[in-house]
UniProtKB/Swiss-Prot annotation:
This is Uncharacterized oxidoreductase sll0816. It comes from Synechocystis sp. (strain ATCC 27184 / PCC 6803 / Kazusa). PANTHER family: BCDNA.GH03377. Keywords: Oxidoreductase. InterPro entries: Gfo/Idh/MocA-like_OxRdtase_C (IPR004104), Gfo/Idh/MocA-like_OxRdtase_N (IPR000683), Gfo/Idh/MocA_oxidrdct_glycsds (IPR050463), NAD(P)-bd_dom_sf (IPR036291).
């Protein structure tokens, strides 16, 4: 099939941006990555050359001034998201924004209103909404397969940061948006909102298991880790349904990523023990009351059109597709920056609940955005 792109995109960030955003944009029939940004121009030029991109920049204003750039993806460290996204929106560029959205919900709300004023489409990269097994669970819940819900539990227990010799960088610093909240809980807050609706209140305990890490830019001197690597969060959902979230990035041999849903008619379990790929490997188990547990097969109509060795790529292609369609149809994408505000809100409230050591109420999202 001949590619006929109608959205030319600049990628900001050479980590996840280079590994996932560029190939996703190059694969999608209606998009083309044409530019890359990195603070080190030599690095940007190297990435541009290896990916056949026309432009490389270490100056964001120059990138945004390029009339050939219609949109940007932002995969820089979280502490840069707000300013970069704000500049892009003000320049009239559509934005695909990595999570966490910003460092504070007030910043995300500002981006939400700014995007509406400038009539640009901003989509958060909440990938689990686009994974077939998760989509099927959403359908089953919508059909009322479990009846009235009684308990929801999330375990996301991985060892990506379990090695104490892993380098100290922005990820180790809470003030720069590092930690398990931004990396993992940002997704969890979104998919719980998608599947079950808004939370009413929450309580939390955040902890740091590995207190120091070596800084390779400072002779491997040990530096303090201020960003949580473990988060235990309790939510109260609609109808007072309890939800327990257990997240850690320092679990050697952790069980992976599991969502357990218990209701009056039985239970659903969605999970993967694949610690090397957070998309591949999800399975669904249904245990109706009075019957044996059975594994469910995801309908082929929900399958990815193409799967890749890197499991992250297929759902991001679907995110890109929703983004492109929303731009072409001049409509708000799903998920939207409104959902990004909600995820950021719960991240902020989690920190507040931990610091104050008591339950905190979750404000109504529409009222928050109307202020």
């Amino acid at each position: 099939m001949t590619k006929s792109p109608n959205l030319t995109v600049a990628v900001i960030g050479t980590g996840f941006g280079q590994a996932v955003h560029i190939p996703a944009l190059q694969y999608h029939q209606q998009t083309q990555a044409i530019a890359i940004y990195h603070r080190d121009l030599a690095k940007a030029q190297e990435v541009a050359k290896s990916n056949d991109l026309a432009y490389s920049y270490n100056n964001l204003e120059e990138l945004l001034a390029n009339p050939e750039v219609q949109a940007v993806t932002i995969a820089s460290p979280p502490f840069l998201h707000y300013e970069m996204a704000k500049q892009a929106i003000l320049a009239g560029k559509h934005v695909l924004l990595e999570k966490p959205m910003t460092l504070r919900v007030e910043e995300t709300i500002e981006l939400y209103h700014l995007a509406r004023q400038r009539e640009v489409q901003v989509i958060p990269d909440f990938e689990f909404r686009f994974v077939p097994a998760w989509q099927y669970v959403a359908e089953l819940l919508g059909q009322g397969i479990l009846g009235q819900l009684k308990l929801i539990k999330v375990d996301w227990l991985v060892g990506s940061r379990a090695n104490p010799n892993r380098a100290w960088n922005w990820y180790a610093q809470r003030e720069k948006g590092g930690g398990a909240l931004g990396a993992l809980a940002s997704h969890t807050f979104d998919y719980l909102h998608w599947l079950f609706g808004p939370a009413q209140s929450l309580a939390a305990n955040l902890s740091v298991a590995i207190a120091e890490r070596p800084d390779p830019l400072d002779n491997n001197r040990l530096k303090p880790v201020t960003a949580e690597d473990t988060a235990l969060i309790s939510l109260t959902l609609a109808n007072d349904v309890p939800c327990q979230i257990n997240i850690t990035s320092v679990a050697h041999g952790g069980r992976g990523h599991w969502l357990e849903i218990y209701g009056e008619k039985g239970s659903l379990v969605l999970g993967s023990d694949n610690l090397k790929d957070y998309v591949h490997g999800f399975r669904i188990f249904h245990h109706p009351v009075g019957q044996p547990m059975q594994e469910l097969t995801v309908p082929t109509r929900l399958d990815f059109p193409k799967v890749f060795a890197d499991g992250r790529l297929a759902p991001v292609v679907r995110v890109v597709d929703e983004w492109v369609q929303s731009i072409n149809q001049k409509r708000t994408p799903t998920p939207s920056l409104r959902h990004g505000v909600y995820s950021q809100l719960l991240m902020d409230l989690t920190k507040q609940a931990h610091q104050e050591k008591h339950w905190v109420a979750v404000p109504d999202l529409d009222r928050l955005l109307a202020q």
